[in-house]
Amino acid sequence: MIIDPIHFKLKDGRSAVLRNPAQEDAEQVLHMFRTIIGETDFLMAYPEEKESLTVEAEAEILDKINQSPDSLLLICEVEGVIAGDCDIRFNSRMKTGHRAQIGIGILKEYWNQGIGTAMFETMISVAEKREGLLQLELEFIEGNARGRALYEKMGFRIVAMKPDAVKLKDGSLRNEYTMIRKM
């Protein structure tokens, strides 16, 4: 799914844009993704799990997502740097077509700049235009207080908990929470 770019200001005054990634962005998107998953335990992968992903494969993935009517991926670009991404995946089956999944990732150096809020506002706006959509869903890992605060600010509420759903490298287990925002 393609949408028009959305320009906004960060809290520190810098200009940013949320836009669909182009195939030419693949290398920087891949670098950003690998960096983000290495900066936190609150995402579902480690950098070494993505080492085999090539720039060419990432470019194909970006193109496929952009062409899909049921997926939207946006990157946040700040002064030529891809600072994060967000996505929404609409279910197309009859029984689950009223649901969509949403996710975000932001480089640590860009935290507390309003990017997450801008991403969620954009994704919610897109979701509101989707006929028949009744709820947005996301998951977060226990301990992600910053993420949880953002999600709650955007109208999401916890509806379920999967005990010990995530096992970290140190062997510790964390619960995973499901949140829903009714449309």
How should each PLM-predicted stretch be described?
Residues M1-R14, D170-M183:
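Terminal substrate-recognition subdomain of acyl/acetyltransferases
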Residues D12, H31-E48, I65:
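Helix-loop element at the rim of GNAT/NAT acetyltransferase active sites that forms part
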Residues A16-H31, K182:
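A short beta-loop-alpha structural element at the N-terminal edge
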Residues E49-H98, G103-E109, V126, K182:
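Acetyl-CoA-dependent GNAT
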Residues I104-I106, N112-A127, A149-K153:
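Conserved acetyl-CoA-binding loop-helix of GNAT-fold acetyltransferases
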Residues F120, A127-E139:
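Conserved GNAT acetyl-CoA-binding A-motif
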Residues Q135-F140, E152, R157-S172:
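Conserved catalytic-core motifs of GNAT/GCN5-like acyltransferases
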